[in-house]
Amino acid sequence: MEAKMNKIDTNVVELEIKVDAKDFNEALKKSYNKNSKKFNIPGFRKGKVPMNMVKKFYGVEVLFDDAINACIDKTYGVALEENNVRPVDYPQIEVVEVGEGKDLVYKAKVTTYPEVTLGDYKGLEVEEVSYEVKDEDIEKQLADMQARNARVETKEEGTVENGNIAVIDFKGFIDDVAFEGGEGKDYPLEIGSGSFIDNFEEQLIGLKVGESKDVNVTFPEAYGKEDLNGKPAKFEVTVKEIKVKELPALDDEFAKEVSEFDTLEELKADLKEKAVKANELRAKREMEEKVINAVVDNAKVEIPEAMINREVENMVRDLEMRLGQQGLSLEQYYEFTGSTEDKMKSYMKENAERKVKTDLVMSAVTEAEAIEATEEELKAKAEEVAKMYSNGAETEKMVDLLLNAQRAALELDVKREKTLKMLFESLK
C-alpha cells in the first residue's frame, strides 16, 4: 500500500491511496466467497458456481463493491496514521482506478481537526468573583421552610386576598369559542404565585365563595402554543372555596420538627454554613468560566463545519433524552415552543461552535503544558464518580468498570481539572 497526501483547503486534505494488484485480487476472491450463494447459473448448484464462471456470466465487476470496501477498510486507517491525519468526519471516497489484475487507486477527501494558535493563557488578569451571604438570605430560606410546613385551612368568611388559595372552576374562550386545555375544576390557585397568565390572579382578589367573574387576559407572544400565542382570552371563573395558610412559629420547636437541630439558632447557623459553601462553589464556577473564556478568546482556530454540525446533533440528542425523562418527545417540544427542528438547530449552532472551540483550545493548552493524568489520579476520579451512584462493595466494582470502560472520559476530566488549576495558579 502507498499513500500520498495533498492539502487542498483549510482543514481539508486528500489522500491518494494505492492498493497492490495482488491484494486487490485477494479481496476479489473474498468477495466471491462472501456472495457465492447469490449467483445462479444453469447447470450449477446454488453456491457452487466457480469464480471463473461468475466472471464470465456476470462480469468481474459484480465482485468490485465488496472488494473495494474491504480494501478501503484495511488501508484507510493505516494511511491516516502514516500521514498523521486526524479526521473529523467520514471521508468522501472516489475510486480512481480499479480492475482485475490492476492496482486499486482511490482518493479520500478528509476533513481534519483544526490547528489551534494559542494566545496568552498564563498570567491573565480576571476580576475576582465573590458572593456574600446576607441575613435576608437566611430569612428567606426560613420563610420558604415555613411555607412548606404551613397548615392549610378553609377561610370561612371574607374574600380572596393575596396569599390565599382560591379553589376555582374555570373555562377559557378565544373569540367566544372554548379552546383545548383551557378548562379546569377544583383547581387550587395560590394568589400571587404567578403560576397563571399575567393579570389572571389579581382579578380574583375581592371575590367571595360562590361568586363568578369573567377574567380577561392576553396570552404571551411566546406562550408555546401557536393557536394561543399573543391572543386575548376570556375565562369564566367561579370561586368554590378559599383557603389560607397558617404558618408555624419560627422557634426551637419548629427547628426540631424540620431538622436534626434542637434550636432555631443551630438551624440558622447550618443554613448559613451551607449557603457560604454554595456561594463559594458558585463563585468558583464563574471564575472558571471567566478564565476559560479569556483563554478561548485569545486563541485562533478555524473550525470545520462538520465539527459544529456534529456538536449540534449531540445537543439535539441530549435534549431528546432529557425530554424523554419527562415523558415528552421532540415533536411535542416543537409544538409547545412553536419551533421546528431547523429553527432549533440554527439556534443551537452558536453555542455548539463556542463549545467546540473551547474544547479544542483547552486541549491545546493541556498539550502545550504536557499535562498528563497519572494512574492514581484516574483511580481517584473513578472513585469520586462511583460514590455518586453507589455505595459499599458496589463502589469498588464500579471503579473497576469506569477505569476500563470510561478510561478516556476520566482522563479527559482529570486533564481538564489540572489545566484549570494551572491557569488559576498563573493568574495575576
From Swiss-Prot:
Q: Does the keyword section mention Cell cycle?
A: yes
Provide the protein's localization: Cytoplasm
- PROSITE patterns linked: FKBP_PPIASE
Membrane-crossing ranges are: none
Report whether Cell inner membrane shows up as a keyword of the record.
no
In which domain of life is the source organism classified?
Bacteria
Q: One Pfam family from the UniProt entry?
A: Trigger_N
Q: What class of enzyme is it?
A: isomerase
User: Which EC number applies?
Assistant: 5.2.1.8
Q: Which reaction does it catalyse?
A: [protein]-peptidylproline (omega=180) = [protein]-peptidylproline (omega=0)
Its Gene Ontology cellular component terms are: cytoplasm
Q: Where's the PPIase FKBP-type domain?
A: 163-248
What Gene Ontology molecular function terms does this protein carry?
peptidyl-prolyl cis-trans isomerase activity; protein folding chaperone; ribosome binding
Q: Report keywords, A-Z.
A: Cell cycle, Cell division, Chaperone, Cytoplasm, Isomerase, Rotamase
Listed Gene3D superfamilies: 3.10.50.40, Trigger factor ribosome-binding domain, Trigger factor, C-terminal domain
Query: Which GO BP terms, alphabetically?
Result: 'de novo' cotranslational protein folding; cell division; chaperone-mediated protein folding; protein transport; protein unfolding
Q: Which residues belong to the signal peptide in this entry?
A: none
Principal cellular location given in the protein's record: cytoplasm
Task: Name the protein family.
Answer: Belongs to the FKBP-type PPIase family. Tig subfamily.
Q: What is known of its domains?
A: Consists of 3 domains; the N-terminus binds the ribosome, the middle domain has PPIase activity, while the C-terminus has intrinsic chaperone activity on its own.
State the HAMAP family in the record: Trigger_factor_Tig
What this chain does, per the entry, is described as: Involved in protein export. Acts as a chaperone by maintaining the newly synthesized protein in an open conformation. Functions as a peptidyl-prolyl cis-trans isomerase.
PANTHER family assigned to the protein according to its UniProt record, in alphabetical order: TRIGGER FACTOR CHAPERONE AND PEPTIDYL-PROLYL CIS/TRANS ISOMERASE, TRIGGER FACTOR-LIKE PROTEIN TIG, CHLOROPLASTIC
Q: What is this protein called?
A: Trigger factor
What species is given as this protein's source? Clostridium perfringens (strain SM101 / Type A)
